[in-house]
Amino acid sequence: MKRYNIVLFTLIVCACSVQAQTVEPITYKQYMHKVSADNLEYAAEKMNVSAAHADVIAAKVFDDPSLSFTYSNNEDHTLQMGQSYELELSQNVTLGRRTAGIKLARSQNELAEIVLDDYFRNLQADATIAYLEVMKQKQLSDIKRSAWSNMYDLAKSDSIRLASGKIMEVEAIQSRLEADIMYNEVLQAETDLKQAYMQLSLFVGTTVTDTLFHPVEELKKPEQVFVLNGLIEGAIEHRSDLLAALKNTEVARRELILAKREKRPDVEFSLGWSHNKRVRNEEAPAPAFNGVSAGIAIPLSFSSLNRGAVNAARFRARQAELQYEQMCLQVQREVMGAYQQFQSQALQVKHYEGGILKQAQDVLEGKIYSYNRGEVSLLEILNAQRTYDEVQAQYIETLFNYNAALVELERNCGIWDIKG
């Protein structure tokens, strides 16, 4: 009896170590709200959209004009040939390059927004699976604890029966050993649960030493009916990574246009004003006068004969189109695979709920009743207990796999209607 009191005390201490942290019950809706609001990686990804928006603003900037001032002295102190001042304002004009740059920046900004949507699509799916994992580990831990409790009670009963001479010592020892083995399984289940809690904290941006979020729901089988053709059509139309690939083809075309525009020569327009002072030289006197000038400068763009940059942009545009076509095929394959996996898991859950659980429980209860009456051996009890535990654990795993398959199906289809 003292041995089992120590074991029970140890379990209580383990539970208290978890409770030393703040354990906060949380619903799936609250959890997903915290993920969208507090996930640090998602917050970092949002900066890409802000940066792309800033790039659009930067692309609208015009080239700065140039203002020059020139002073000339024609040996005025010695020959009295006068002095002159000249102001010139010049402006460089790009022939369509700025407009192409603005359109490219806008397309890149739209691409960044779609990529952010795709990041959140994967984030909410991964976060949901982590939430399901905690529920699974919690229920598996409860199964292990219940099995240990049953064996613990049986071992205590065997100790009493041994003292009264109803069973042999070896049977009492074996029941104690089985209880000890199950206790180790309980400890491992508790460890797995703690690790699942830590993963959940990572998604909501809290430290594991601060708060542990405990899902209030349990694994269940939500009824969902899907039509494969509709799923494929919806995925091609709505899936964010496919939309990003399509937008990337637009970005590549914009880059090609910009590469062509950059081959155009820049034209520089200038406007000047000058003032010449009076020339007092006796041989060539001249009055003071003002002058106005206007000019245009066109560079000789021999470098535009090199078509390397344009050809590279053209190849990238074609590459983006091929990548989009390949992704369309890949999306169809992923949707079909996820649909088949979901259908398989649904059948497995239905099979378990068809009576296997109830049968395993009835067998165990019958064996325990017969054992207490001395009609069956301890080995039969252990076999029935292991069978019942395995059936329960496999059912929980199957429920988890069903829900995870549903998450993956909706992830691959680009839809999301999971409410928890």
Each PLM stretch: what is its role?
Residues 20-71, 166, 208-250, 299, ...:
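Bacterial Sec-pathway N-terminal export signals of envelope proteins
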Residues 189, 240, 398:
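Metallo-beta-lactamase
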